[in-house]
Swiss-Prot record:
<dbReference type="InterPro" id="IPR012128">
    <property type="entry name" value="Phycobilisome_asu/bsu"/>
</dbReference>
<keyword id="KW-0602">Photosynthesis</keyword>
<keyword id="KW-0042">Antenna complex</keyword>
<keyword id="KW-0605">Phycobilisome</keyword>
<keyword id="KW-0813">Transport</keyword>
<dbReference type="GO" id="GO:0015979">
    <property type="term" value="P:photosynthesis"/>
</dbReference>
<keyword id="KW-0472">Membrane</keyword>
<dbReference type="GO" id="GO:0030089">
    <property type="term" value="C:phycobilisome"/>
</dbReference>
<comment type="similarity">
    <text>Belongs to the phycobiliprotein family.</text>
</comment>
<comment type="function">
    <text>Light-harvesting photosynthetic bile pigment-protein from the phycobiliprotein complex. Allophycocyanin has a maximum absorption at approximately 650 nanometers.</text>
</comment>
<protein>
    <recommendedName>
        <fullName>Allophycocyanin alpha chain</fullName>
    </recommendedName>
</protein>
<keyword id="KW-0157">Chromophore</keyword>
<dbReference type="GO" id="GO:0031676">
    <property type="term" value="C:plasma membrane-derived thylakoid membrane"/>
</dbReference>
<dbReference type="InterPro" id="IPR038719">
    <property type="entry name" value="Phycobilisome_asu/bsu_sf"/>
</dbReference>
<comment type="subunit">
    <text>Component of the phycobilisome. Heterodimer of an alpha and a beta chain.</text>
</comment>
<keyword id="KW-0089">Bile pigment</keyword>
<keyword id="KW-0488">Methylation</keyword>
Length: 161
């Protein structure tokens, strides 16, 4: 839920106008909107590069994943692994645009540990893939933008730990 929606819901629940503090937070949210959109555009435009480089980093760091018997062994399973990374990158861009982790939490984190466990996929490897995406994606952004985006990657990594 965005800061705007949260503020309105809270104020309405108390049958009051928005407080000066709530209005300041909304102003800050609106002011930072252009930056959040720019970050999401950069990451979306570079998504193939981010996924490819992150996948390469993951497979170098975790060769067990692509070795015979590994969850990403073979062309089809490697493609599935990269598809999952793409899915998480997309969720991160949603969170960045929203200025909130709620889209990541509600769409992608609930049940993720159980799902990967049932598939026999080591969640640590998935988290490592997200770390690799963070490294690639933030290298494409300016310092302030990289810090903003990095927080959403960190949230997802933490949720997987």
């Amino acid at each position: 839920m965005s800061i705007v929606t949260k503020s309105i819901v809270n104020a309405d629940a108390e049958a009051r106008y928005l407080s000066p503090g709530e209005l300041d937070r909304i102003k800050s949210f609106v002011t930072s909107g252009e930056r959040r959109v720019r970050i999401a555009e950069t990451m979306t435009g570079a998504r193939e590069r981010i996924i490819k480089e992150a996948g390469n980093q993951l497979f170098q760091k975790r060769p067990d994943v692509v070795s015979p018997g590994g969850n990403a062994y073979g062309e089809e399973m490697t493609a599935t692994c990269l598809r999952d990374l793409d899915y998480y990158l997309r969720l991160i861009t949603y969170g960045i645009v929203a200025g909130d982790v709620t889209p990541i939490e509600e769409i992608g984190v609930v049940g993720v540990r159980e799902m990967y466990k049932s598939l026999g996929t080591p969640i640590e490897a998935v988290a490592e893939g997200v770390r690799a995406m963070k490294s690639v994606a933030t290298s494409l952004l300016s310092g302030e933008d990289a810090a903003e985006a990095g927080a959403y990657f960190d949230y997802l990594i933490g949720a997987m730990s």
